[in-house]
């Protein structure tokens, strides 16, 4: 018997002046202590980005929860997403955290900043395998879960925070990792951790975000 249970929380802020968020998080529980979490970032911002990210996260989470392969998910997304008339591409990133029986996590990443994992209150440099599926470079990791592991997935609006204001080149992933590592010992909930991260991004943007920013913590 496995006594681990997952705590999931996420928070987004919109690009300044936009009513809709171009990032989307979808969570699907499959009833056997397995959960699919997808964070997607649609190209650009506003309505089009929102549609792209919502479709992407819904398609992936639903198909994976039904037991279909990652290859089938990626092919379905490529065939389904509306193509941008200006740039000629249908583009949306994704980070997938697939918890299986609350024992292992499959982490699948396409074009988002690499997820941060904190284990034993320290940043853990976890193994990754590079794959190509449907012409997309995808990173996959299979991780045996331990108690108090923390996964932090984010859209690129997080490391872009502070560009040209607080930092010349944004709030880099390593800086975000250090920030999250400093919070780990306090035992905050996933929702609180994701909120603290995104609130810090909002502050670095001067409360006028230049991009949608989303953090999802598991």
Language model regions located:
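Regulatory cytosolic signal-relay segments
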Residues: 1-20
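Beta-strand-turn-beta hairpins that frame and shape the catalytic cleft
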Residues: 3-6, 31-34, 101-104, 146-148
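Acidic loop->beta-strand submotif enriched in PP2C/PPM serine/threonine phosphatases
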Residues: 18-31, 125-163
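DG-centered beta-turn motif at the end of beta-strands
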Residues: 41-42, 112, 150-157, 212
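A short alpha->loop->secondary-structure connector
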Residues: 117-127, 168
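Juxtadomain coupling helices with adjacent low-complexity linkers
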Residues: 160-200, 204
């Amino acid at each position: 018997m496995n006594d681990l249970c997952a705590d999931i929380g996420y928070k987004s802020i919109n690009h300044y002046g936009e009513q809709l968020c171009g990032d989307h998080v979808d969570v699907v529980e499959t009833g056997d202590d397995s959960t699919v979490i997808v964070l997607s970032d649609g190209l650009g911002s506003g309505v089009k980005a929102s549609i792209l990210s919502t479709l992407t996260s819904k398609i992936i989470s639903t198909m994976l929860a039904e037991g279909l392969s990652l290859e089938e998910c990626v092919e379905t997304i490529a065939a389904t997403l509306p193509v941008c008339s200006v740039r000629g591409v249908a583009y949306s990133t994704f980070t997938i955290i697939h918890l299986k029986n609350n024992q292992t996590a499959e982490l699948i990443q396409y074009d988002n900043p690499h997820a941060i994992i904190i284990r034993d209150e320290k940043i853990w440099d976890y193994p990754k395998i590079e794959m190509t599926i449907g012409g997309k470079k995808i990173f996959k990791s299979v991780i045996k879960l331990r108690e108090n592991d923390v996964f932090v997935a984010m859209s690129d609006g997080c490391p872009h925070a502070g560009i040209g204001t607080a930092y010349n080149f944004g709030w880099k992933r390593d800086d975000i990792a250090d920030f999250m590592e400093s919070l780990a010992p306090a035992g905050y909930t996933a929702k609180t951790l994701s909120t603290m991260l995104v609130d810090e991004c909002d502050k670095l943007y001067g409360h006028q975000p230049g991009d949608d920013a989303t953090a999802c913590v598991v």
